[in-house]
Amino acid sequence: MKTIIKATVMGLMLIASHSALSAETTETSTDKILPYPIYQHKMDNGLNVVTVPFDSPGLASLHIITRVGARNEVEPGVTGFAHFFEHMMFRGTDKYSKEEYSAALKSTGAAANANTTQDRTAYHMTGNSDKLELMFELESDRFMNLKYSEHEFKTEAGAVKGEYTKNFANPYSQIYEKRSETAFNTHTYSHTTMGYFDDIVDMPNQYEYSKLFFDRYYRPEYNTVLVVGDVTPEKVNALAEKYFGAWQRGSYESVVPVEPEQTETRYVHLQDGTIPAYFSMSFKGPAFSDSSIDMPALDVLASIVFSSTSDLYKKLVIEEQIVRSISGGASDSRDPGLFTIHVSMVEKEDMPYVLGEIEKAIARVKAEDVNAALLERTKSNLKYSFAMGIDTPGSIAQSLSHYIQLTGDPESINRLYALYDKVSAADIKMVANKYFTADHLTIATISDDELGVLK
C-alpha cells in the first residue's frame, strides 16, 4: 500500500528489455521503472494472469487481487462484506476443509494471508516454487468452491464485530471513520473497510446476502492472478488454464455513486483526552491515473512541503517543538480521494497557530516555484526508495498488486514513473492551486474539549 509520501512505491529508473511470448503481452520500452519483464495473459473467462520472472531460486510469490473493496458496497445496510470475505475465504471447501487447507499449504512452505482496502481485497502467499501447482490448486478451489454453513458464517461475523470493537477503541481509528463520513456524503468512500457498526451488528442476519456477494464478485473478471519469482510465464499460464479455466464469468457490475462537488469547509471533532491533541486537513484530490501529471506532482509536493526534511517540519517539530509530528500525502484510489495532512500536537492551544503555518506553506507553494535542485533531488530520492524495496518476490508482487487494484494493469507502474521524471515546478504550483482550496477541505480534530479548537 501507498505510504504518506509514497516512500515505498518509488523507484530507481532502471533499464529493462522484454521479449514477448505469443500468449502474453509485454511492453518493450527501455525506460521502465521495474527492471523485470511483466508478462500478461488474458484468459477467455476474463481472468488476468501476470507473471514476473525473478531470480529467487526455489521461491515464488502468488497473489490474487480481487478488485472489490468497500468502494463496491453500494447497498445500504450491508457494508463491510468485502473485508468479511477476507475472513471467510479461509473457511474451506468440500475438497479441502479449513484444517486440510492449512496442512496442504504448510507442505508448500507458504503461509497465506489477506487484507482489504477501499478498492480491493488481496490474497497472498510465498512458498516453494516447485509446489506452485499445489498453490494453484488450493487457491482455485477456494475461489471457485468456497463453502460455509450459517453457523460458521455467524461465528465469523462475531469475530469481525470483535475486530471492529478492538480497532475502534483507538481514537485515531475513530477520527478516521468520522473524517470519511464527513468528507464524503454520497460516495462509498464515506465508510471504512470495516463497514458501519450498525451493519456489523446486523451481519449475523445476512447469511443469504453473503452468498450473493460472493457470487457477484468472486468471478474471474474481477480477479488477477500474479506470480513473481522462480517461474516462467509458460508454466504459470498453463497452471492458470488448468485450475481456473472452468471458472465462470459473472455479469454483475456495481454502480458506485459519484460524490458531488464540495462547496465549503467541513469540520468534525472527537472529544478524547487519552492521546495528544491531533488535527488533520483533508483536501479533495484526484483519482489515480497513470496518464495524468496530477498525482505524481502531488506526491513530489508532499515530500517537499510535509516530509521530515521539509522547512515546515524543521520549524514546527525541531525548532519550535510545538508539534510532535507532521506528514501529508494523497491517497491512491480508483475514484477521487483525499490529500490529508496529519498533525500531532504538543499542546492543543497551538492548533490555530500551526494551522496558520500550514496555510502559509501552502500559499507559498501556490505562488512560488520550488527550488530546481530540491525538485530534482526529491524526485531522485523518491525513486531510490522504491529500488530499495523490490528485492524479494513478495515485495515485487506487493508493489505490482497496488497498481493492479487501481487500473487492472501492472504496467501502470511503469507509465506512472515515466510521469514522475516529467514533474516540473509549474506542475507543483498547478496542483497546489487546483486541489488546496477551502471549499474542498475537511478539518478533523481530537482533543479533550467538547468542541473542536479549530472550528
Task: List the predicted regions and their residue ranges.
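Cleaved targeting-peptide boundary
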Residues: 23-31
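Charge-rich, well-structured scaffold segments of protease-associated domains
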Residues: 42, 100-252, 319-455
